[in-house]
Regions:
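Hydrophobic anchor at the beta1->P-loop junction of P-loop NTPases
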Residues: 8-10, 96
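ATP-dependent small-molecule kinase phosphotransfer cores
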Residues: 34-94, 100
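Post-Walker A helix-loop "phosphate-sensing" segment adjacent to the P-loop in P-loop NTPases
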Residues: 25-32
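ATP-binding Walker
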Residues: 14
Length: 173
């Protein structure tokens, strides 16, 4: 059975990468953080001189200090076709982890780039991200995963959801 293409979204540091790691490690999905993908593709080259980064890893590690700048760089990358990055991500991986722009979301949704959208919520512990680096909202997702408990709770919640989304292909690897 073919795995559905999953778009995993949510506010910064709410657990998107952790959800994707669970999907990779236990359910055979592939993913790369969109921030890492973009850092490797173009952001490091665009910012290395401005911030004096020695290498791509240093640029990627510093991304939280420049959220709005990264957001705008990714928006610019997706002109004129707002679904460009999404198509590139899904050509290489089963999951696109970390989309933040509603224009790109709508472009991908309207062209069938992804199958399902999962919002990761940790709002009981962390604030929402600023609007200058995040324009998506929970209502845009097909499903919401609660990440307000323990890591074990999160793994259980991911398992329940993936068994519902793809019940015939969820044997743990």
């Amino acid at each position: 059975m073919i795995k559905p293409k999953l778009l995993v979204i949510g506010h910064g540091r709410h657990g998107k990468d952790t959800v994707c790691e669970i999907l990779r490690d236990h359910y055979g999905y592939t993913f790369e953080s969109s921030s890492k993908f973009c850092s490797l593709q173009f952001i490091y080259n665009d910012l290395k001189e401005k911030y004096g980064y020695a290498n791509e890893e240093e640029c990627y590690a510093d991304r939280h200090n420049h959220r709005a700048e990264w957001y705008n760089a990714i928006c610019d990358y997706n002109v004129p076709d707002a679904a460009t990055l999404g198509r590139e991500m899904f050509a290489a991986y089963d999951i696109y982890c970390g989309l933040r722009n509603k224009r790109e979301y709508y472009a991908m949704k309207n062209t069938g780039v992804f199958d399902k959208v999962i919002w990761v919520d940790r709002s009981d512990h962390l604030p929402p991200e600023s609007n200058d680096s995040m324009s998506l909202e929970p209502w845009m997702a097909d499903y919401i995963i609660d990440n307000n408990g323990t890591l074990g709770d999160l793994a259980f919640n991911v398992g329940q959801l993936i068994n519902y989304i793809n019940p015939y292909d969820t044997a743990q690897c």
